[in-house]
Amino acid sequence: MFTSINPATGEEGARFEALDDDGIEAALARAEAAFRSWRVSEIAQRTALLTGIADAFEANKQHLAETATKEMGKTLASAVAEVEKCIAGFRHYAAKGPGYLEPVETKAASGRVVGHWLPLGPVLAVMPWNFPYWQAVRW
């Protein structure tokens, strides 16, 4: 069991069940299954989803910031700034992402090389959580 504790007050917040080995394997399997369908989705679907997430963050900015403040001890101003950075990030990738995924052609000694961006699949990362929302956006 994990319990969120407000570092400023010591007050207990939400509680979360820890995953056992089977729970971890099930979560990884769900991530892999989601990847298989996501990797063949249309770019328009992806950009619409990113825009929708940005809109949801915008609509819930104060709540998200207050949650980060309670769970991490961040100042409210810092938490709001992080949420706003995430909104900008989602909107940036919705607008510019399709261009980033275009094939890249380069001259080579033997002619030309065309690079294609291919999905990697689920990424498991151990990262510091001083910017919890941004961690999800930047990956």
Identify what each model region corresponds to.
Residues 104-139:
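Conserved small-residue-rich beta-alpha loop and adjacent elements
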Residues 1-111:
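N-terminal Rossmann-like NAD(P)+-binding subdomain of aldehyde/semialdehyde dehydrogenases
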